[in-house]
Amino acid sequence: MNITKVVEGIWGKKWSPSEGVEQDTECDSALLDHSHLVAERFPQKSFNLDRFPLQIKNQTIFEQVNIFFDMTDGNPSLIQSYLREEEKFKQVFRKLWAYNSVWIETTLPNVNVETAADALDSENKKIRVKEIHSQLKASGSKSMKINNLHDFELFLELGLREKVSTVYIFEDMKICVWSNFDFTLPLYSDDDKYTELLQRICTTEGIYLRSLTD
């Protein structure tokens, strides 16, 4: 199976993200570049995974409470605060991974892999991400099925740290999450039953599933 078939499995014949792409727009993405199209088409099923229960519209206030990975450069006192927040998101993703076949579409083949690897905190992770980068480049693909939790967490860290954009497709639950928006991650959930489950998981881990219609 390829990523196009996986994406088709989310909506069947009801809709395809490619329908929203203008004909004169060059796009080779099955889903990665289309979070906004999904949200426009299905606002009631679209959410953000977020640190905050509501959008903070005052930018001055948001900047004072926001935290992201690059803020920790030259400021070691922030790294533990950042890692605590990151772990909350990783716990949610781990639980989704455990119950699903997981596919990704990613920009990893198109980025400077040395720069991306520098954001990872162990030599094993740096080596592995370079291996995956080479494999994807050699195959000419931007997508893969993730069977290994270690590989899954590599992409999580690279996305949350804003180094590599990736969309995660949790095939069984028909949940899609786009990562490279620091700690605000667009999400689509097709089935209300699994949306409710995800809401409980988020609450347990200390983050919010924020509706776009709130």
Positions of PLM-derived features:
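Structured alpha/beta or helical-core interaction and ligand-binding surfaces enriched in interleaved
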Residues: 1-184, 189-214
